[in-house]
Amino acid sequence: MNQHLLEQFGTTHERVERGLAALRTGQGVLVADDADRENEGDLIFAAETLTPAQMAMMIRECSGIVCLCLPEERVSRLGLPMMVAHNTSSMGTAFTISIEAAEGVTTGVSAADRVRTVKAAIDDAACPGCLRSPGHVFPLRASPGGVLERRGHTEATVDLMRLAGLKPYGVLCELTNPDGTMARLPQLVDFAQRNRMTVLTVEDLVAYRQDKGL
């Protein structure tokens, strides 16, 4: 990881704290993973404060595969089966079947419809009947131990929400360049500067949790 690019966002702990503060106020954060892993950066928002404008940004600036990160208990409550019985993904990404809100959407693909689907899935009264499949939102099941168990964006998202005191549900999408290639740290930092966001890394979050015994 190119640390000098990250220094403008503070120390390891400061970057995490800034990210948590941003999430608490309904803003997004950018999270980069290890250079020897996916070497990608994700735009992340809290599911409970997500707006259609923020969803539109994710659709416009990112890969378009908008994912809803959920802890295991929420996946079970919604009755969502995993996308495949035998996961052969190189990173072990835990996709469930895709979802759509059962009510309040049209085709399900617009920013507003996708937000409606997210809100339906995280509602306190949510149940399997609140959703339809397939759909245009892709849930991801986080490992119970968070980033201390798996250093993925899914776990980082759920960990950040919990540390921020929010519901443990977040939405992510991989940031891409205008030509469709994946954004790396330099492009991630540039995007953050242009959009007044902060950048942190999965490694920062691991260190933060370990140092604080969380």
Curated annotation (Swiss-Prot):
- Tell me which residues bind D-ribulose 5-phosphate: 37-38, 42, 150-154, 174
Q: How is the cofactor bound?
A: Binds 2 divalent metal cations per subunit. Magnesium or manganese.
List site positions: Essential for catalytic activity.
136, 174
Q: Which InterPro entries match?
A: DHBP_synth_RibB-like_a/b_dom (IPR017945), DHBP_synthase_RibB (IPR000422)
| One GO BP annotation of this record | riboflavin biosynthetic process
| GO MF assignments | 3,4-dihydroxy-2-butanone-4-phosphate synthase activity; magnesium ion binding; manganese ion binding
Keywords attached to this Swiss-Prot or TrEMBL record, sorted alphabetically, are: Lyase, Magnesium, Manganese, Metal-binding, Riboflavin biosynthesis
Question: Which residues of the sequence carry a binding annotation for Mg(2+) 2?
Answer: 38, 153
Q: What class of enzyme is it?
A: lyase
Catalytic function, reaction form: D-ribulose 5-phosphate = (2S)-2-hydroxy-3-oxobutyl phosphate + formate + H(+)
A single Gene Ontology CC annotation of this entry is: cytosol
Q: Which cofactor does it need?
A: Mg(2+); Mn(2+)
Pathway listed for it is: Cofactor biosynthesis; riboflavin biosynthesis; 2-hydroxy-3-oxobutyl phosphate from D-ribulose 5-phosphate: step 1/1
Which residues are Mg(2+) 1-binding? Answer: 38
State which Enzyme Commission number(s) the record gives: 4.1.99.12
Signal sequence segment: none
A Pfam family that the UniProt record links to this protein: DHBP_synthase
Assembly mode? Homodimer.
Family from the record: Belongs to the DHBP synthase family.
Q: What is known about what this protein does? A: Catalyzes the conversion of D-ribulose 5-phosphate to formate and 3,4-dihydroxy-2-butanone 4-phosphate.
Per its record, how is this protein called by name?
Answer: 3,4-dihydroxy-2-butanone 4-phosphate synthase
